[in-house]
Regions:
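N-terminal core-binding DNA-recognition domain of tyrosine recombinases/integrases
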Residues: 11-27, 33, 37-121
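NUDIX/MutT-family hydrolases
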Residues: 124-126
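Gly/serine-rich nucleotide phosphate-binding loop at the start of the catalytic core
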Residues: 6, 31
Length: 126
């Protein structure tokens, strides 16, 4: 099986960049890994894009927006969970923009997806 650019950069992002260059905590690394596991499952099950054939060019703004909507509609995720998944995707595309400048426009489009306002819990005063 031929390695795709998405597989190569996602592997580097999760196993080298986050723990080494960024120094992220193990829980952050696991949360990011889980976010991309969900994205890959979404691509396979909803978009008919097999993970082993997924390329960076296919993971565009429209796909990410559909993924986020799927999280809310089908998995009943709250805005805060959706925003956590989006933060992982944003972080990856920020990394990718520097590693592969030819994707800068696509990266900027994905990075333009805003966080959704999440309900804040009421303040409890004594």
């Amino acid at each position: 099986m031929k390695e795709t650019d998405f597989a190569r950069y996602l592997t580097h992002f999760l196993s080298v960049y986050l723990p080494g260059q960024v120094g992220s905590k193990r829980n952050t690394q696991l949360a990011y890994r889980d976010s991309f596991s969900l994205l890959l499952k979404y691509c396979r099950d909803q978009e008919n894009l097999s993970p082993e054939k997924l390329t960076i060019a296919k993971v565009d703004k429209e796909l990410v927006v559909r993924f986020l909507q799927w999280l809310e509609d089908e998995r009943n995720c709250k805005a805060s969970t959706r925003n956590q998944r989006l933060a992982a995707i944003h972080s990856f595309f920020s990394f990718l923009m520097v590693e592969e400048p030819q994707y800068i426009q696509q990266c900027q489009q994905v990075l333009s997806i805003p966080m959704k306002k999440a309900d804040k819990p009421p303040l409890m005063y004594l």
